[in-house]
Amino acid sequence: MTSSAAAIRLGFEPFVNASPVELRTNWSDSDVQAVISATYRQVFGNEHLMLSERLTSAESLLASGNISVREF
């Protein structure tokens, strides 16, 4: 079984099918949340983390524009 087939069987979409997410100029709060979710999904393999596992200070800095997505 391939990893894509296993991902589908387990109920989540493989990364191959995910489109790139960018944070461009004049972003909205929903854009920031989409980037944060995509980052958690790519780095941790899961965007649904427990509250204690979330990087709340980094999320806040990103949402306020104090750091870039790369720095996040």
Swiss-Prot record:
Subcellular location: Cellular thylakoid membrane
PROSITE patterns: PBS_LINKER
Domain PBS-linker, first and last residues per copy: 1-72
GO cellular component, one term: phycobilisome
Subcellular location, principal: membrane
Record-linked InterPro entries: PBS_linker_dom (IPR001297), PBS_linker_sf (IPR038255)
BP GO annotations: photosynthesis
Signal sequence interval, chain numbering: none
Alphabetical UniProt keywords: Antenna complex, Membrane, Photosynthesis, Phycobilisome, Thylakoid
Pfam families in alphabetical order: PBS_linker_poly
Keyword Membrane included in the entry's annotation: yes
Top-level taxon of the source organism: Bacteria
Membrane association type: Peripheral membrane protein
Function, as annotated: Rod linker protein, associated with phycocyanin. Linker polypeptides determine the state of aggregation and the location of the disk-shaped phycobiliprotein units within the phycobilisome and modulate their spectroscopic properties in order to mediate a directed and optimal energy transfer.
Family listed: Belongs to the phycobilisome linker protein family.
Name of this chain's protein: Phycobilisome 37.5 kDa linker polypeptide, phycocyanin-associated, rod
Species whose genome carries this gene: Pseudanabaena tenuis (strain PCC 7409)
Phylogenetic placement of the source organism: Bacteria, Bacillati, Cyanobacteriota, Cyanophyceae, Pseudanabaenales
